[in-house]
Amino acid sequence: LAVGIFTPGPNNITAISHSAVHGARSNISLLIGMVIGFVTVHLIIGSVVEQIDEESVFFSFLEWFGILFFVALGIIILRLPIERLSVDQDIKRLDFRHGIALQFINGKEWAFVSVIMIQFLDGFGGGITGILLITSITTTAGLLSMILWTFTGHKLMATLRDERKG
């Protein structure tokens, strides 16, 4: 859970870069949208996983696809040149709509939630109860992670802009 939530991905990078440019308070609306989208993606994937037979080839494909996606994403992120990660001062402010939309195009999230639901849904009781339990745990941890990344981005830029420290 911690690896999926605290490693860099679209949500974390958006939270840190947006707060670095616009300040930590600017992320409140964005984070609310991220949570709404995150919960929606969990409910969609949980409902699909609940309906798929665990012994099916499709279920195995989803499981392995999610794992391979994480590995590939990690390799790609580690190989990115640092120049590509520079902060552009012209970044527009984002709001809850962007936070929601990001969840539907965030491949890391879809893979992460798929793997979590496939591996743990039955252990959490299955059905809507299991889906809601997993959703509440991962959403809480994800929100805490986004808050941490938000304050990190804000503090980092404040330090770099300071005449004495930066």
List the predicted regions and their residue ranges:
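Selective transmembrane alpha-helices of multi-pass membrane proteins
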Residues: 55-85, 139-149, 157-166
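Alpha-helical membrane-protein architecture signal
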Residues: 93-101, 129-133
